[in-house]
From Swiss-Prot:
The modification Phosphoserine is found at S21, S32. The gene is PPP1R14B. One of its GO terms (biological process) is innate immune response. The modification Phosphotyrosine is found at Y29. GO terms for cellular component: cytoplasm. Phosphorylated primarily on Thr-57 by PKC (in vitro). An unknown Ser is also phosphorylated by PKC (in vitro). SUPFAM superfamilies: Myosin phosphatase inhibitor 17kDa protein, CPI-17. Ubiquitous. Expressed at low levels. Inhibitor of PPP1CA. Has over 50-fold higher inhibitory activity when phosphorylated. This is Protein phosphatase 1 regulatory subunit 14B. The keyword Cell wall biogenesis/degradation does not apply. Residues 1-55 are annotated as: Disordered. GO terms for molecular function: protein serine/threonine phosphatase inhibitor activity. The modification N-acetylalanine is found at A2.
C-alpha cells in the first residue's frame, strides 16, 4: 500500500485504538519525503501539522462559490428537463458563466445560450430567461492576476 517513491510521501497506517476507546479505527498518516515543504534549513519543523485554508476559498468568497455551485446544479437540472434525459446523457455543451458575465447585454447573453442549445428540441426561452435572472449580479470567478 505505501510507496515511499510517490510525490505525496509515504502513507503510514497506525494500529486501531484498543477496545472501548471509542476511536474510529485505523488512521492513515502521510509522511513527507525528505526535502519537502515543511522542512526549513534547520531540519524538520516540530510544530506539527498546520491546517491551511483551501486555495479556492482563499482566492474567492465562499458566498460567491456557493452561488456558483447552486447555479451549476440548477443548470444541470434544467438541461436534463430540456433534453429529456439523465445527466450523463446530456449533449456535450459548456455554458460558461464567466463568458456570459463578460458580455455587454442580456440580448448578447441570450443569443450565446440559444446558440449553445441549438440541438434542443424543446422550447428554451424559459431556461434562458431564468439563467439570465440568476447570473444578474454575480461576480466572475476568473483567477485573480498576481501583481
Amino acid at each position: 500500500m505505501a510507496d515511499s517513491g510517490t510525490a505525496g510521501g509515504a502513507a503510514l497506517a497506525a494500529p486501531a485504538p484498543g477496545p472501548g476507546s471509542g476511536g474510529p479505527g485505523p488512521r492513515v498518516y502521510f509522511q513527507s519525503p525528505p526535502g519537502a515543504a515543511g522542512e526549513g534549513p534547520g531540519g524538520a519543523d516540530d510544530e506539527g501539522p498546520v491546517r491551511r485554508q483551501g486555495k479556492v476559498t482563499v482566492k474567492y468568497d465562499r458566498k460567491e462559490l456557493r452561488k456558483r455551485l447552486n447555479l451549476e446544479e440548477w443548470i444541470l437540472e434544467q438541461l436534463t428537463r430540456l433534453y429529456d434525459c439523465q445527466e450523463e446523457e446530456i449533449p456535450e455543451l459548456e455554458i460558461d458563466v464567466d463568458e456570459l458575465l463578460d458580455m455587454e447585454s442580456d440580448d448578447a447573453r441570450a443569443a450565446r445560450v440559444k446558440e449553445l442549445l441549438v440541438d434542443c428540441y424543446k422550447p428554451t426561452e424559459a431556461f434562458i430567461s431564468g439563467l439570465l435572472d440568476k447570473i444578474r449580479g454575480m461576480q466572475k470567478l476568473s483567477t485573480p492576476q498576481k501583481k
